[in-house]
Amino acid sequence: MVSVSEIRKAQRAEGPATILAIGTANPANCVEQSTYPDFYFKITNSEHKTELKEKFQRMCDKSMIKRRYMYLTEEILKENPSVCEYMAPSLDARQDMVVVEVPRLGKEAAVKAIKEWGQPKSKITHLIVCTTSGVDMPGADYQLTKLLGLRPYVKRYMMYQQGCFAGGTVLRLAKDLAENNKGARVLVVCSEVTAVTFRGPSDTHLDSLVGQALFGDGAAALIVGSDPVPEIEKPIFEMVWTAQTIAPDSEGAIDGHLREAGLTFHLLKDVPGIVSKNIDKALVEAFQPLGISDYNSIFWIAHPGGPAILDQVEQKLALKPEKMRATREVLSEYGNMSSACVLFILDEMRKKSTQDGLKTTGEGLEWGVLFGFGPGLTIETVVLRSVAI
């Protein structure tokens, strides 16, 4: 008779979870950051708020963002005036948009990832979907299963309302699934659409304006699995270790509330300070077992909550400016796409490493870190190992 431990052993993969493909997608509508304040104050009928507009222009200018992609076009906003007001009841209109757009954009990214992976989609065993937008039942995971034509017995996981740290969470979950289920191939999809958070400006709620200056729409998809099939599957990064922690004394630093007026965000001024204060401890926990204490010797993928967070982390750890190159590039070209951001940065890094003729997918280095920061204040840490190009 076979023992439970033998069954358990047979169920587990041999090697570490590996990212085998990455795909990304954005809505067609691209907005230039330099002219966005004009558009934003016009469409929200707020042009009379001249001081507030000047403040918003300064926020946009300092954001280090060149452009963002948004599902919400001028036409859509004109058809939905309640979405343009500051706190008008508008949840129905917002939900009707995002329950369609989140799976649609997610499908676009997933199709690209599946194509790069090169295996039939029938080999996908698990699906993880993450979004901060829209909550219907059955959820976006079900809609994606249908849109992609996945098998009905794919094991699905739906993560709603996590926020900006969740790009790390989906990797942590995918790693556990891939390593504990021999032959598992996990499709991960983060799809974020800001239609749920867009609203007009308010003199009394400036942290809402910060979100209006930073957030963009995007979806990213990965295929994750252990023990890649030689000659068919091409590993991009290995996931070696993961952790999640709530930063001490950080309650209320980042809050989101889904109400009749949509999703509102509240940020404390010291979010960059809280992140930079706690990052050293997270790095020691992650890299001490590997004998690494020089954080300029690893590659960096950090959720770009905003330029101030990146600046303070760089300063605190005395990082060379080029360490955050991929992170700042994604922030500049897409804005803050919540959970999808770090997956876009993974894609940017492996592509640039190949273009530049470097030895590994991680800018020529072996070890790297991926950080997610978000409501809680929650910090996700993933230790990555690059792959030779």
Swiss-Prot record:
Keyword Acyltransferase in record: yes
Active-site residues, as the UniProt record annotates them: C164
This protein's pathway: Secondary metabolite biosynthesis; flavonoid biosynthesis
Catalysis performed (reactions): (E)-4-coumaroyl-CoA + 3 malonyl-CoA + 3 H(+) = 2',4,4',6'-tetrahydroxychalcone + 3 CO2 + 4 CoA
Source superkingdom: Eukaryota
Keywords, sorted A to Z: Acyltransferase, Flavonoid biosynthesis, Transferase
PROSITE patterns: CHALCONE_SYNTH
Keyword Transferase attributed: yes
EC assignment: 2.3.1.74
A GO biological process held by the record: flavonoid biosynthetic process
Top-tier EC class: transferase
One term of GO molecular function: naringenin-chalcone synthase activity
CDD domains: CHS_like (cd00831)
InterPro entries: Chalcone/stilbene_synt_C, Chalcone/stilbene_synt_N, Chalcone/stilbene_synthase_AS, Polyketide_synthase_type-III, Thiolase-like
Pfam families: Chal_sti_synt_C, Chal_sti_synt_N
Similarity-based family: Belongs to the thiolase-like superfamily. Chalcone/stilbene synthases family.
Biological role: The primary product of this enzyme is 4,2',4',6'-tetrahydroxychalcone (also termed naringenin-chalcone or chalcone) which can under specific conditions spontaneously isomerize into naringenin.
The protein's name: Chalcone synthase 4
Organism: Medicago sativa (Alfalfa)
UniProt gene name: CHS4
